[in-house]
């Protein structure tokens, strides 16, 4: 292993050893307290441009499964996207020897193959304590013998444009009951799986697609998760504003998760703010304000919606974080639209809130019933969609 250093801008440095790619990188340092699921976390597009610090001390002990494995819908079985999305990882104790029946390579070999920096042998407890007190910080992993990059503010970059699909994709259901449009801001594979498994033919659009022009072809619209500052997604926000203002689609069901929740809030006139160190874990309690029930949720976000800035006659808070009291969801007062900051489809993580997908499909069923009782589909002219089947 080469000598390596984890360096925080205007903060401490930590000496260790590289077990990933022989290159230095920079990015925003964030941490996750999740105990398992490092393959899913590292391939989650929401982590794009970030250096992920694991609080779990032993990482890599069950290796990395095959990227070739597919499920019954031909979606990736073990990962949230087809490549590692994090800029680098920081672990206390890397397990070079791994053991799991699905594993085909070590975490270190995977990082080397994907060109991702990785450092071990550092005190992650001290790093996380610093990040909790000072907030998520610009940082670098410096590997001996490689060029030194400048500190990079990934949050000032339009990261969604990097991870969103460049063409319209299509994932068919075996027994379809609905057609759903997904705005891909960095959508996780398990979100697509959660929709298709419930009978949705899913059409995945680029983040800047004019969804307002084709929404009339669909029974519902889903706004996906994704990386970075939501305010950089100007095109998506403007498109959503037009969609929400369309008088012919006032009853179209819409569901947003994570960044999709934030973009829906911005399109509705609300504001977002950056959290000091974000919420990234599999065990965060959130209360459903409509029932008073508490659910354990999986989260990965550095920004939050300010519910006080939403139009109060149209929106009300849906969920609240019981740790820091931040907003975790909102629901429209008269239309079938709702969103959550957390991930109901958690992989890994708890499945307490998976029924929110069922709520979305119930809204779709009501919408389809409403349309069947009308004499026409309430959009005058809809352009054709050129789409490619399969999601890599």
From Swiss-Prot:
A GO BP entry: L-arginine biosynthetic process
Primary localization class, coarse: cytoplasm
Entry keyword annotation includes ATP-binding: yes
GO molecular function: ATP binding; carbamoyl-phosphate synthase (glutamine-hydrolyzing) activity; glutaminase activity
GO cellular component terms, semicolon-separated: carbamoyl-phosphate synthase complex
Domain spans labelled Glutamine amidotransferase type-1: 179-370
Catalytic activity: hydrogencarbonate + L-glutamine + 2 ATP + H2O = carbamoyl phosphate + L-glutamate + 2 ADP + phosphate + 2 H(+)
Catalytic site: 258 (nucleophile), 343, 345
Localization in the cell: Cytoplasm
Enzyme Commission designation: 6.3.5.5
Domain of life from the UniProt record: Eukaryota
Pathway involvement of the protein, from the record: Amino-acid biosynthesis; L-arginine biosynthesis; carbamoyl phosphate from bicarbonate: step 1/1
Keywords: Amino-acid biosynthesis, Arginine biosynthesis, ATP-binding, Cytoplasm, Glutamine amidotransferase, Ligase, Nucleotide-binding
PANTHER family: CARBAMOYL-PHOSPHATE SYNTHASE ARGININE-SPECIFIC SMALL CHAIN, CARBAMOYLTRANSFERASE FAMILY MEMBER
Stated role: Small subunit of the arginine-specific carbamoyl phosphate synthase (CPSase). CPSase catalyzes the formation of carbamoyl phosphate from the ammonia moiety of glutamine, carbonate, and phosphate donated by ATP, constituting the first step of 2 biosynthetic pathways, one leading to arginine and/or urea and the other to pyrimidine nucleotides. The small subunit (glutamine amidotransferase) binds and cleaves glutamine to supply the large subunit with the substrate ammonia.
Family stated for the protein in its record: Belongs to the CarA family.
Subunit-structure text: Heterodimer composed of 2 chains; the small (or glutamine) chain promotes the hydrolysis of glutamine to ammonia, which is used by the large (or ammonia) chain to synthesize carbamoyl phosphate.
Descriptive protein name: Carbamoyl phosphate synthase arginine-specific small chain
């Amino acid at each position: 292993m080469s000598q390596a250093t984890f360096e925080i801008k205007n903060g401490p440095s930590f000496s260790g050893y590289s077990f990933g790619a022989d290159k230095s990188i920079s990015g925003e340092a964030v941490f996750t307290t999740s105990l398992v699921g490092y393959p899913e976390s590292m391939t989650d597009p929401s982590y794009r441009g970030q250096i992920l610090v694991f609080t779990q001390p032993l990482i890599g002990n069950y290796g990395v499964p095959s990227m070739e494995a597919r499920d019954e819908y031909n979606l990736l079985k073990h990962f949230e996207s087809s490549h590692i999305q994090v800029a680098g990882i920081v672990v206390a104790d890397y397990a070079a020897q791994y053991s799991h029946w699905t594993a085909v390579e070590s975490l270190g070999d995977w990082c080397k193959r994907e060109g991702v920096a990785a450092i071990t042998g550092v005190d992650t407890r001290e790093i996380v304590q610093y990040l909790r007190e000072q907030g998520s910080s610009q940082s670098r992993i410096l590997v001996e013998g490689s060029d030194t990059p400048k500190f990079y503010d990934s949050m000032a970059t339009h990261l969604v444009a990097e991870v969103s699909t460049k063409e319209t994709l299509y994932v068919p259901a075996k027994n379809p009951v609905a057609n759903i449009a997904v705005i891909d801001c960095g959508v996780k594979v398990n979100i697509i799986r959660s929709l298709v498994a419930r009978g949705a033919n899913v059409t995945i659009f680029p983040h800047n697609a004019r969804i307002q022009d084709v929404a009339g072809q669909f029974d519902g619209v889903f706004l996906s998760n994704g990386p970075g500052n939501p305010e950089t997604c100007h095109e998506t926000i403007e498109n959503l504003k037009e969609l929400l203002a369309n008088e012919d689609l006032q009853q179209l069901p819409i569901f947003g998760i994570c960044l999709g929740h934030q973009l829906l809030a911005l399109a509705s006139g609300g504001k977002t703010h950056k959290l000091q160190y974000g919420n990234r874990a599999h065990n965060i309690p959130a209360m459903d304000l409509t029932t008073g029930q508490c659910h354990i949720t999986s989260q990965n976000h550095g920004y939050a919606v300010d519910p006080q800035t939403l139009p109060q006659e149209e929106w009300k808070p849906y969920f609240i974080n019981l740790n820091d009291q931040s907003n975790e969801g909102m629901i429209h007062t008269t239309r079938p639209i709702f969103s959550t900051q957390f991930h109901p489809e958690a992989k890994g993580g708890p499945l307490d809130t998976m029924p929110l997908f069922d709520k979305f499909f119930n809204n779709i069923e009501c919408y389809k019933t409403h349309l069947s009782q009308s004499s026409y589909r309430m959009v005058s002219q809809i352009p054709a969609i050129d789409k490619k089947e399969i999601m890599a």
